[in-house]
């Protein structure tokens, strides 16, 4: 980054913001890059601001029993805040003084006061000086207040992040990722957007008092009539605001439902395409959209009338103020025009500034209180360690994940009695609520010496991970003692990859040791994988390492744990995603050799690992089932296999530990922090028996967005959720918002705070941060470039010259240094965080406007209608102005008039009434015309938004995966959330406001020019200067906003990344390291945001200067031109002042319209995505008069009306697959054939392309070559017809928000009897019957109440219902408990006995059921043969299969020399199969 010119700028340059000129010039001439942005001043550094606020907050905590965050903020920022408030007040005072000078100028034209004509020019100079002074005071004050708001936000951002790293796991279990992102985005945005308005809470009352005093001097008691009307108007607007918020609360639930379904669709778009559910998902979302739009229109109409009431209230304010006075004392033009000017200022203070200020304080104080509560939550407590200790000891340890759960679960069980079924059976759903009321670990004892290996085993839910968490201090023991040195390293069960290079992920901020690093890489079998990357270990990994396979991610996580020099290594099932050969090699070379002198605790279920362990601890239902050596285990616990592998009969499981639908998910439910409802009520709300979604998912919009576990901000989770990446082009007051909330757009009073506890926000079901940390993370999709880098160290001291890539490319070393990737440039940051679809022009093109306008044929006619009404309004206004300008009004009782005045007429009571009747009639006409002018416009624009959403949804569903793979899920979701919200809420009313303000300014200029033609000499240059200056500014400002939005992405991405890996971060003690990274992300965003604020103020100040010059010209032309009467001069100067008061609003609206139209540009980008083929509906076959619901195609290779496929024969010829067009081939020249009904197993290392081959079969990739099914080539039929030939069980199971019935049959083709029949076949019936409502029970959060195995059964049922003849299975047994796995095995044998099955699996017993095996190595087919031939040849399969498996396969080949190992008498045959399990 460049050094900021602000550091050397003079006072004048700072006052006029001239120091921003270089960046404006560069942005106008060329495209701005991150390197062009100026460095932030040290006063804006996140390090300095956070340290300052943290010091005051600690002081507050130490000195008071009831600490207040606002006190800490006051000590940090109060005096600067008040200084700028005084400047703002002085600027506002000039607005009250201006009408006084206007009245004196008009009075100087009174025929009876010719002596005062000579002072008019001096009064004009004074009036112009007031405008100049106001300009010089107002803009520095507003900029200073925005600056303070920004600093407050940065300081609290940092404070919240630091607190997040300290929170206890119990607190994290009650906080969702959406809450944290909301805390950082929606709540803290109030300081950026509202601090400039906060001072009006005291400025507005003073302004009103001053104005009322001045109006009293003119009109006496009549002044309060106008004030009363304004107060009534404000109350009316408040009522409209409450009505609008009622509609928005109702709509929030509907928006949330749509976004939940949309986010699930985006996250699982590959599954949607594989199942051919595009039409079903589109119909489902469009139905929700229709309901949402009904409420959107109602809210928009209310907002429209609210805004219109303000615009057209001016007539009545003046009328009600002047009428009583005129009826009593007659009319004086000076008083009319002065009153009009006063009323303009008074109206703004009463109906806008003061209510906005009150709402700002209400929202800000609410946000501060919410942040304050968060900062006082329980922190993570480190255990007391003894660094000299060499052993690990646990004595009589008992622990709960949550204390005090017993009473809650008892209440839940009592309430469940009301949910018993009609036959009297207990509702099994509530039978397991007591689980968390029991200890997760109970009376655990063990001791291991230095250098020993402890293997921890047990069935699912036995407490293995909880044991590791307790050793790390994440889970506090309620009883007992834990003893170890405290120097811990940890490898999580689910791989956690942070954005950065492979090298940075392994080193993880620790000082670099070349020898140790290379040894770890070799031991973890990463050498071959790294060698395939052009940048080697310096390749930049994005969201969760999406470019890597699951096995590669697992090995990187293990390497990170091993690289750290620790006394105790905790390894939580690190081999889950590895093939058998890689697993064996890593276990031997890494765990047994490289770490031989280290103390290790390994969670495993492998018999080979238990045999080599020094000690074994088997957990069962949280208790220690066995502790000792392997030989002792065989002698003392011959039934250990059932406890180890979980082969107890399902019916024999205890009620607390039964493998039901809740056992592994209970901790996912928790209360919203401030929601005043009970846990039980929350559960009841979540599981109502109704088909409607609205009562199931009343989450906030933010939580729905962040229900995606991919964050491209982040997310961008991202809630921001993405969590979180966007080029936000909203108006200033919403620019930092991650996602649209129920309050986006212009404030309607009284606005309800984001932190409200209304019904739409009170009851929530969400996944806590703890659950996110303990479950596999769904990865985003992005493309990352490969880069090279050399490294050097720099000190940790704050540096102003850190580049934007420092966010993730520079890493702290153990000696408080940073690892810097020097050769990584800005492009790498874009690849980690930016979407490829974001390359839109800096300024909205005219083509976008034209395309938007012509999208709906009625919109053009509506715009013409608005223009006609405007011309009518101008004509009506001229009628009033003619009466005011050509009729001399005088006080009643004063009948003196000049005979020389050609217009001299004494106004009697009768004629006064006559004039005011005309005025009232014209005012009523204008009000009616104004209301009817904008209403069709708002209605039509919402219809256009509906069309855009439909087109974009259809385009995304029909887009090829090669295009979608280049986008981030958060980026796609933000199109449907943020951009659609802008199109629904902000854009229609902003366009209306802009048109209204533009017409006011144009109309005023036109009238002034008509009354005094010489003013045209000043009008033309001013208009030209405005247009040129606006174009010059927008070219740079929009680029700065893009960069600011891009800079916001790493902030939320880093937050979400930190939360996902919090246990790892704390185990490694890298909290300071991640705090520094977070501060760098904040500094990057601050640099862009601060520069945007400065350039925006530069533009607005110069626009105001231009119009001040225009006002000066108008003033002196009207004063110096002879022959003008007081009416004409009053009209000209009053309208000129009205232009000045409306100008800034109009300018801001013009900028906002251009910014919001960028959302339209982004939507058009998605609409214009290519399609992957024409979607066609399958032909329905009828047999015996009944709909068979089986696909029939018309093809030259198939006889007419033959059902296809009939056998499932596949022929693959020269198949080549690529993820993106023009990319490297993932599979090359694959050729083989599969006979009908045959089972084929896919073999290969992790990352060899097995899953890619299955995707290629479904044509989800860019493919070349040919595949035929039963003689039909994939080129001869449509894409949907081809995919319907397959049944799919993917690795990542897709369960969308909806009923069981909808999830199994989204097209509603099958009857309940048929669905229940299939549920029986696959073993799903008992699961569904546990829920209230059965098939009508609504699943939410990706089916979080279902275990992974139950979700696999859902996929199996879908495939059975689809009547598919070819079944593709991609590691269906991953993370399954043995009971569910056996159910799936049996279901596969029964339901797909005559189908072709292609299986990618790691369990040997499943693969042994295949007749043919396809071995893939180096992107090609190495072997394809039967199991007999593969066993006789040297192959991957021969190395993987054990001797015992060969004996079971070919018992007649058993050699007499071979002696089987001693058998444990009580082991069941099925259990022995599992004991000998290995992975491929």
Curated annotation (Swiss-Prot):
Gene Ontology MF terms in the entry = ABC-type transporter activity; ATP binding; ATP hydrolysis activity; bicarbonate transmembrane transporter activity; chloride channel activity; chloride channel inhibitor activity; chloride transmembrane transporter activity; intracellularly ATP-gated chloride channel activity
Find the cross-link Glycyl lysine isopeptide (Lys-Gly) (interchain with G-Cter in ubiquitin): 688
Residues passing through the membrane, by range: 78-98, 123-146, 196-216, 223-243, 299-319, 340-358, 859-879, 919-939, 991-1011, 1014-1034, 1096-1116, 1131-1151
- Family membership noted in the UniProt record: Belongs to the ABC transporter superfamily. ABCC family. CFTR transporter (TC 3.A.1.202) subfamily.
Which InterPro entries does the entry mention? AAA+_ATPase, ABC1_TM_dom, ABC1_TM_sf, ABC_transporter-like_ATP-bd, ABC_transporter-like_CS, ABC_transporter_C-like, CFTR/ABCC7, CFTR1_ATP-bd_dom1
| UniProt-annotated location(s) | Apical cell membrane; Early endosome membrane; Cell membrane; Recycling endosome membrane
**Stretches for region Disordered:** 1452-1480
Query: Where does the chain bind ATP 1?
Result: 401, 434, 458-465, 493
Q: What is this protein called?
A: Cystic fibrosis transmembrane conductance regulator
Which residue numbers carry lipidation of type S-palmitoyl cysteine?
A: 524, 1395
Q: What does this protein do?
A: Epithelial ion channel that plays an important role in the regulation of epithelial ion and water transport and fluid homeostasis. Mediates the transport of chloride ions across the cell membrane. Possesses an intrinsic ATPase activity and utilizes ATP to gate its channel; the passive flow of anions through the channel is gated by cycles of ATP binding and hydrolysis by the ATP-binding domains. The ion channel is also permeable to HCO(3)(-); selectivity depends on the extracellular chloride concentration.
Domain ABC transporter: start-end pairs: 423-646, 1210-1443
């Amino acid at each position: 980054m460049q050094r900021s010119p602000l550091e050397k700028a003079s006072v004048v340059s700072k006052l006029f913001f001239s120091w921003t000129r270089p960046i404006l010039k560069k942005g106008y001439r060329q495209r701005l890059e991150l390197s062009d942005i100026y460095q932030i001043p040290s006063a804006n550094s996140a390090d300095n601001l956070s340290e300052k606020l943290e010091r005051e907050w600690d002081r507050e905590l130490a000195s008071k029993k009831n600490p207040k965050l606002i006190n800490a903020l006051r000590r940090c920022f109060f005096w600067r805040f008040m200084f700028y408030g005084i400047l703002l007040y002085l600027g506002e005072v000039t607005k009250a003084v201006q009408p006084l000078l206007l009245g004196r100028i008009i009075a100087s034209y009174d025929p009876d006061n010719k002596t005062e004509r000579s002072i008019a020019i001096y009064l004009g100079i004074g009036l112009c000086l007031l405008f100049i002074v106001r300009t010089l005071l107002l803009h520095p004050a507003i900029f200073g207040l925005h600056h303070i708001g920004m600093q407050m936000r940065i300081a609290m951002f940092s404070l919240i992040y630091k607190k997040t790293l300290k929170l206890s796991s119990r607190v994290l279990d009650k906080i969702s990722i959406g809450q944290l992102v909301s805390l950082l985005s929606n709540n803290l945005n109030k300081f950026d957007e509202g601090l400039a308005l906060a001072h009006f809470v005291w400025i507005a009352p003073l302004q009103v008092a001053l104005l009322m005093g001045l109006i009293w001097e003119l009109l006496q008691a009549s002044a309060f009539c106008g004030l009363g009307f304004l107060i009534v108007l404000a109350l009316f607007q408040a009522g409209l605001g409450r009505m609008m918020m009622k509609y928005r609360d109702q709509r929030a639930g509907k928006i949330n439902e749509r976004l939940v379904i949309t986010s699930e669709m985006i996250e699982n778009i590959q599954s949607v395409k594989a199942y051919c559910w595009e039409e079903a998902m589109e119909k489902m979302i469009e139905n929700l959209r229709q309901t949402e739009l009904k409420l959107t229109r109602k809210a928009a109409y209310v907002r429209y009338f609210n805004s219109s009431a303000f615009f057209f209230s001016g007539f009545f304010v003046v009328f009600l103020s002047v009428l009583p006075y005129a009826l009593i004392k007659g009319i004086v033009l000076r008083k009319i025009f002065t009153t009009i000017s006063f009323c303009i200022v008074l109206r703004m203070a009463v109906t806008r500034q003061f209510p906005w200020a009150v709402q700002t304080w209400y929202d800000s104080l609410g946000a501060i209180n919410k942040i304050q509560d968060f900062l006082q939550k329980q922190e993570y407590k480190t255990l007391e360690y003894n660094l000299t200790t060499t052993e690990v000891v646990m004595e009589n340890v008992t622990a709960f994940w949550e204390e005090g759960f017993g009473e809650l679960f008892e209440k839940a069980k009592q309430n469940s009695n009301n949910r018993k079924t009609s036959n009297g059976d207990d509702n099994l759903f509530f039978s397991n609520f007591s689980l968390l009321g029991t200890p997760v670990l109970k009376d655990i004892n063990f001791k291991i010496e230095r250098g020993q290996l402890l293997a921890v085993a047990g069935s699912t839910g036995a407490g293995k991970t909880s044991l590791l968490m307790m050793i790390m201090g994440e889970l506090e023991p309620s009883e007992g003692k834990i003893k170890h040195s405290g120097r811990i390293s940890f490898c999580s069960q689910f791989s956690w990859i942070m954005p950065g290079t492979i090298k940075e992920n392994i080193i993880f901020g620790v000082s670099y040791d070349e020898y140790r690093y290379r040894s770890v890489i070799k031991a973890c079998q990463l050498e071959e994988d790294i060698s395939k990357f052009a940048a080697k270990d310096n390749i930049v990994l994005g969201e969760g390492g999406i470019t890597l396979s699951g096995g590669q991610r697992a090995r990187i996580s293990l390497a990170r744990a091993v690289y750290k020099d620790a006394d105790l290594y905790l390894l939580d099932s690190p081999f889950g995603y590895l093939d058998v050969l890689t697993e064996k090699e890593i276990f031997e070379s890494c765990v047994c050799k490289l770490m031989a002198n280290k103390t290790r605790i390994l969670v495993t279920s492998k018999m080979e690992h238990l045999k080599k362990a020094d000690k074994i601890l088997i957990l069962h239902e949280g208790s220690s089932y066995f502790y000792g050596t392997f030989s002792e285990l065989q002698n003392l616990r011959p039934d250990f296999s059932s406890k180890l592998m979980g082969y107890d009969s399902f019916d024999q499981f205890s009620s607390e530990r039964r493998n039901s639908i809740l056992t592994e998910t209970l901790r996912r439910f928790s209360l919203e922090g401030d929601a005043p409802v009970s846990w039980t009520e929350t559960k009841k709300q979540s599981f109502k028996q109704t088909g409607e979604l609205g009562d199931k998912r009343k989450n906030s919009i933010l939580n729905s967005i962040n229900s995606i576990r991919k964050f491209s901000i982040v997310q961008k989770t991202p809630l921001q959720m993405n969590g979180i990446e966007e080029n936000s082009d909203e108006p200033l007051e919403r620019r930092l918002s991650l996602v649209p909330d129920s309050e986006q757009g212009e404030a309607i009073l009284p606005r309800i705070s984001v932190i409200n506890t209304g019904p739409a926000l009170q009851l929530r079901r969400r996944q806590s941060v703890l659950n996110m940390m303990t479950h596999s993370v769904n990865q985003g999709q992005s493309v990352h470039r490969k880069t090279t880098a050399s490294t050097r160290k720099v000190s940790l001291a704050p540096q102003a010259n850190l580049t934007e890539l420092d966010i993730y490319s520079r890493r702290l070393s153990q000696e408080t240094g940073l690892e810097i990737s020097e050769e990584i440039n800005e492009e790498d940051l874009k690849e980690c965080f930016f979407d490829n679809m974001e390359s839109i022009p800096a300024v909205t093109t005219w083509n976008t406007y034209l395309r938007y306008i012509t999208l709906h044929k009625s919109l053009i006619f509506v715009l013409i209608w608005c223009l006609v009404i405007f011309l009518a309004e101008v004509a009506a206004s001229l009628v009033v102005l003619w009466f005011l300008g050509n009729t001399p009004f005088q006080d009643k009782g004063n009948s003196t008039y000049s005979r020389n005045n050609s217009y001299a007429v004494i106004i009697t009571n009768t004629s006064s009434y006559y004039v005011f009747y005309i005025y009232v009639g014209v005012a009523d006409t204008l009000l009616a015309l104004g209301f009817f002018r904008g209403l069709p416009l708002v209605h039509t624009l919402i219809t256009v938004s509906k069309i855009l959403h439909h087109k974009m949804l259809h385009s995304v569903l029909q887009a090829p995966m090669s295009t979608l793979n280049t986008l981030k899920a958060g980026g796609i979701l933000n199109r449907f959330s943020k951009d659609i919200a802008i199109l629904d809420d902000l854009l229609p009313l902003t366009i209306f406001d802009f048109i209204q303000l533009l017409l006011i300014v144009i109309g005023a200029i036109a009238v002034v020019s008509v009354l005094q033609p010489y003013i045209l000499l000043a009008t033309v240059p001013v208009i030209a200067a405005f247009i040129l200056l606006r174009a010059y500014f927008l070219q740079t400002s929009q680029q700065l906003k893009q960069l600011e939005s891009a800079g916001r992405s790493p902030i939320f991405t880093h937050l979400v990344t930190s939360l996902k890996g919090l246990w790892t971060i704390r185990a490694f003690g890298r909290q300071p390291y991640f705090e520094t990274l977070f501060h760098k992300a904040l500094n990057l965003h601050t640099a862009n945001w601060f520069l945007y604020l400065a350039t925006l103020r530069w533009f607005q100040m110069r626009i105001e200067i231009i119009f001040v010059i225009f006002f000066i010209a108008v003033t002196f032309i009207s004063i110096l031109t002879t022959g003008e009467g007081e009416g004409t001069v009053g009209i000209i100067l009053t309208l000129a002042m009205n232009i000045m008061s409306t100008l800034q609003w109009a300018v801001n609206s013009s900028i906002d319209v251009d910014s919001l139209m960028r959302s339209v540009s982004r939507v058009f980008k998605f609409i214009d995505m290519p399609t992957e083929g024409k979607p066609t509906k399958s032909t329905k076959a009828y047999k015996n008069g009944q709909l068979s619901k089986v696909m029939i195609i018309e093809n030259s290779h198939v006889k007419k009306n033959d059902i296809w496929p009939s056998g499932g024969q596949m022929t693959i010829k020269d198949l080549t697959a690529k993820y993106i067009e023009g990319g490297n081939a993932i599979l090359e020249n694959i050729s083989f054939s599969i006979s009908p009904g045959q089972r084929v197993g896919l073999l290969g290392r992790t990352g060899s392309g097995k899953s890619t081959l299955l995707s290629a079969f479904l044509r989800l990739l860019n493919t070349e070559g040919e595949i035929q099914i039963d003689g039909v080539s994939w080129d001869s039929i449509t894409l949907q017809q081809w995919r319907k030939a397959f049944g799919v069980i993917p690795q990542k199971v897709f369960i969308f928000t909806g009923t069981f019935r909808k999830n199994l049959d989204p097209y509603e083709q099958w009857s309940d009897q048929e669905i229940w029949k299939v549920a029986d076949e696959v073993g799903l019936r008992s699961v569904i019957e546990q829920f209230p409502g059965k098939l009508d029970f609504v699943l939410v959060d990706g089916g979080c109440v279902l275990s992974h195995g139950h979700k696999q059964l859902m996929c199996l049922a879908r495939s059975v219902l689809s009547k598919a003849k070819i079944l593709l299975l991609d590691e269906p047994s991953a993370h399954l408990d043995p009971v569910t796995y056996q159910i799936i095995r049996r279901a596969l044998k029964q339901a797909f006995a005559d189908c072709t099955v292609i299986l990618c699996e790691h369990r040997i017993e499943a693969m042994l059921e295949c007749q043919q095996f396809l071995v893939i190595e180096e992107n090609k087919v190495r072997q394809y043969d039967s199991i007999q031939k593969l066993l006789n040849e040297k192959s991957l399969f021969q190395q993987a299969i054990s001797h015992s498996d060969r004996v079971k396969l070919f018992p007649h080949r058993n050699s007499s020399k071979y002696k089987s190992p001693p058998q444990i008498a009580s082991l069941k045959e099925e259990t022995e199969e599992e004991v000998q399990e290995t992975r491929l």
